[in-house]
Amino acid sequence: VVEAIGQERLERVRLQTPKGIIEIECDRLACGFGLVPNTQLGQLMGCQIKDNAITVDDYQCTSQPQVWAAGECTGFGGSELAMVEGSIAGYAAIGQNEKARQLFAQRQRYRLFAHLLEKSFNLRAELKTLARPETIFCRCEDVTFDKVAKRSSWIDAKLHTRCGMGACQGSTCATAAACLFDWQLPNSRPPLLPTRVKSLMAMSTSPLNQK
């Protein structure tokens, strides 16, 4: 998909094909530009991150002692792989390493699918050239691509354009910035998600805090 076109609503899309660019009339368009694991909690706990995923050993243990990770945060591989990783992490956490090892072969089989998934969703280089100067880069704050492209880093972009300062706190545009400009992703800070003041106030009166 090269461009979505319309007034008030989507009317047609422009596609790049081996025979050239064509236009197709349509009412809806769904695009997928890769899958990005959510590693914020791991980052906050000081776990090592590599290739946008929490690194783990054979027993799903992270770089932090007594912290195990499984599933999406260690890299996308499908629900079956996530379930097996969770079982291995659970057994390892309670010291049942022998039972954990019995699942290693099953995990390896599902990892073959994960490798194919990664290959299928790996972004092609030409996608980095799709954005135009007027392309909306940060939808929360209506910041265009040209304004962000002039900055030298993620922090610089936030300070001068308000990119990533909206409701999602950069959960979408920060990853795009890392991909397009090779910027380092921002460090996670609590709260990880937008939180109501009412919820924060309730924490101080929680029964758990009163014990």
Predicted regions and their residues:
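Dinucleotide-binding/catalytic capping subdomain of oxidoreductase cores
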Residues: 1-5, 15-16, 56-57, 106, ...
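Conserved beta-strand-loop-beta-strand element in the redox core of flavoprotein oxidoreductases
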Residues: 4-23, 29
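Conserved active-site and cofactor/substrate-binding residues in soluble primary-metabolism enzymes
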Residues: 5-8, 24, 33-36, 40, ...
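FAD-site-proximal beta/loop scaffold in flavoenzymes
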Residues: 28-80, 103-106, 112
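Glycine-rich phosphate/pyrophosphate-binding beta-alpha loops
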Residues: 72-79, 162-170
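Mid-to-C-terminal Rossmann-like scaffold of FAD/NAD(P)H-dependent oxidoreductases
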Residues: 81-84, 88-156, 164, 186-188, ...
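Short cysteine clusters
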Residues: 138-140, 168, 173
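Alpha-helical interaction/regulatory segments in DNA maintenance proteins
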Residues: 170-183
